[in-house]
Amino acid sequence: MKFLDEAKVYVRSGDGGPGCVSFRREKFIEFGGPNGGDGGRGGDVWVECVEGLNTLIDYRYQQHFKAKKGEHGMGSNCHGANGADTVLKVPAGTQIFSEDGETLLADLTEVGQKIRLAKGGNGGFGNAYFTTSTNRAPKHANPGQEGQEMWIWLRLKLIADAGLVGLPNAGKSTFLASVTAAKPKIADYPFTTLHPGLGVVRSDGREFVLADIPGLIEGAHEGVGLGDKFLAHVERCRVLLHLVDGTSEHAGKTYKLVRGEIEAYGNGLAEKPEIVALSKADALDADTLKSQVAKLKRAAGRAPLILSSASRKGVPEALRALQTEIDASAEAERKPVAAWQP
């Protein structure tokens, strides 16, 4: 499935149906009086968060969504039918912005959430509504109220428990493939991964969702290499697994480069728990491995995990460390906030 995390769409709710001008006509009833019914209400436009989606690709091919108009009123005081609603289905993690791209209208984070973007117009009154003591036979009715229209931006931020970060070719996709059923493209060149991906990890009888984003480069927080868009997908993660390529020239400098981009990006990303791991350990001899571990430890301020996704060395330990941080974060959210006391 192709991945799309941003789309601009046009929505319009339905116009209300016009009221009816009608008079009762029956045999032997000369002045039957007005009996025009009201018009139906226009349909609404809704956005609903549903299961089974992790991309906005459907909105690449269709950008205009219009609800149905209300039906016109009829004689015999028959009201017009209401217009059908239109529902835009989006994955969990979708944010809705106004046309300026900055005003947040809604943030849909849970399946089942549903918001109304545009309300349908009210139906017009039929001439029966305008009957008064001084005007027993009104000959006018209201037109229906116009619907609302707007352009909106849909932006997806993937919802995962843990996120993988690192430079291109750091082994993130290989790690994801080794611990989940996901099948990301893997090759020995930078930028093999072009789109974020998700996988479900099953470890020690537990499950959590792991997100893999394309590799970051210097200037990512400013949009270089679309880095700012990719970092947005790990904003909602509880913990980051920072993979540092053991075959790089200097593991410590590599770590600091990515860490600097995370801190410059902001939005609370730098405050998230981080697990540091040296990847591709199977490709290093003992002396090089020892040297790279020492450099990375000095840069990160703590001893890194040593990983090899190919041989699975250190993988179970990494998964347990991730699960521990995820549990700690979830527990912190569940703690009740003490009531304020003067």
Curated annotation (Swiss-Prot):
Q: What is its main location?
A: cytoplasm
Give me the Gene Ontology terms describing cellular component. cytoplasm
Q: Which InterPro entries match?
A: G_OBG, GTP-bd, GTP-bd_Obg/CgtA, GTP1-OBG_CS, GTP1_OBG_dom, GTP1_OBG_dom_sf, OBG_GTPase, P-loop_NTPase
Q: Where is the Obg domain?
A: 1-159
Supply the alphabetized keyword list: Cytoplasm, GTP-binding, Hydrolase, Magnesium, Metal-binding, Nucleotide-binding
Enumerate the residues binding Mg(2+). Answer: S173, T193
GO BP, one annotated term: ribosome biogenesis
On assembly, the entry states: Monomer.
Q: What is this protein called?
A: GTPase Obg
Source organism per UniProt: Methylobacterium radiotolerans (strain ATCC 27329 / DSM 1819 / JCM 2831 / NBRC 15690 / NCIMB 10815 / 0-1)
